[in-house]
């Protein structure tokens, strides 16, 4: 088992006994009580910490698909029929048939897979332009792998570009891009896909689903372990350097995958530093307050302002 995976497991197990704190949206860690600096100063500090770091480990967390113009464009027919307010509502709806479920999932996956690279990602890329970096993400929206090569990204919660067997009869995953395109084309203006296009495992015939945690029995096989190997090897190679752990948008559902490991590693590595950007919380542990920065603001605004400050 790799270093980072072991750390995630330990922190996840610890969280079970502290469920009340997490359920309330808080954290059991002792947080800094220092008054945050004004926003403009935080942006200056962010830019300075980027420049001072030898390397950066980015932790990309939650990005939400809300009820906006883009959502209505792609999902309007489902919103009108079922009353959904955002794309993720439909992902876990109790659908009456597999054909109806895949009508929605195919639309969701097609929209995700073909979405253009969003500006916050372009701004982040400019910020990291002169740095040795690696990206660890719990996002499955493929934005990071559109931007960076496979070896520079660890997707520890899966990837919408792949299908897996719902029974986990095989360790293999397979391409989802072409089947998704075929389902969307066949569905047209309707709400359901043809029965013969419902994705199935080529080995046992069971229904397939996206290789993403949350859809069912998430396959934690070779591809999953590869994600942890990549980030663990990067950490091992850079442990003696000035690593900046950059946490972007980690929510309260899964803090043990990015946030808490970043806190632990910052505390353990004497030259490490830490930045968190979140529009809902401003958590900075007391143990790393002298080497940390927590910015409560919109990620898109922060990254745009840091990029401007750096002149990139």
Q: Could you say what each language-model-derived stretch is?
A:
Residues 1-312:
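Conserved catalytic alpha/beta core of Sir2/sirtuin-type deacylases, generalized to analogous enzyme cores
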